[in-house]
Amino acid sequence: MGQKINPHGFRLGITTDWKSRWYADKQYADYVKEDVAIRRLLATGLERAGIAKVEIERTRDRVRVDIHTARPGIVIGRRGTEADRIRADLEKLTGKQVQLNILEVKNPEAEAQLVAQGVAEQLSNRVAFRRAMRKAIQSAMRQPNVKGIRVQCSGRLGGAEMSRSEFYREGRVPLHTLRADIDYGLYEAKTTFGRIGVKVWIYKGDIVGGKRELAAAGVEAGRGAPDRPRRERPAGTRPRRSGSSGTTATSTEAGRAAAETPASDGASAPSAETTES
């Protein structure tokens, strides 16, 4: 199952978060359609900007759009003209006030979406697919936070009559481990032989203490009773022993005194009442 499913959807709520964050009842379908239109608008108008992901948050009268890009200068434009144009297009599309945030991706070689887009651009420029895949893998494995990568190309590779899929992998990519931080990207290259799909999986280590694990740990801690402090036993005393009628006399002061007094052969040891008197 982990080999086929989208890694982001497979780990939602465990190690990954939703890219659209809002609540709706009757307008749910309209909001989903609107989110798809927003992402499509940004993808078609900013192909060369290197957009890694788009996050959308909604309030009652405002929409916040966060664009994570490797080239923020292209998105902002000269004196912010491009950003103003994008904001105007989004406000026209949504009919609400739009807050546009442009965030720079610090390490584009470790972002799966940007790696897939880079391989697809090379395929469109008639670069050999094996060379493009190996070059992307070498660049990604140089990053300190990348533990493994897998790149797959599907389509009429090299102009072959029959389409096929080929992939290269380096390092470790545990797709079925839920705590694994797997970044996934998909992009399509438009070539003269048709479209070639490029998929990239990047493994960045394990996330210990995900959302569900932390929540479960909090619930278990709330259920358990608080530990009571243990009292120190005075030196030279014996632990109490339970008898048929409660505590024996050896656990009391009188019992200890009677135990320490040596008894004669013909006389029995004095009882607790005799010692007290």
Curated annotation (Swiss-Prot):
Residues 242-261 have a biased composition (Low complexity). It holds the Pfam family KH_2. GO terms for molecular function: mRNA binding; rRNA binding; structural constituent of ribosome. Keywords: Ribonucleoprotein, Ribosomal protein, RNA-binding, rRNA-binding. SUPFAM superfamilies: Prokaryotic type KH domain (KH-domain type II), Ribosomal protein S3 C-terminal domain. GO terms for cellular component: cytosolic small ribosomal subunit. Belongs to the universal ribosomal protein uS3 family. NCBIfam families: rpsC_bact. PANTHER family: 30S/40S RIBOSOMAL PROTEIN S3, SMALL RIBOSOMAL SUBUNIT PROTEIN US3C. Part of the 30S ribosomal subunit. Forms a tight complex with proteins S10 and S14. This is Small ribosomal subunit protein uS3. It comes from Mycobacteroides abscessus (strain ATCC 19977 / DSM 44196 / CCUG 20993 / CIP 104536 / JCM 13569 / NCTC 13031 / TMC 1543 / L948).
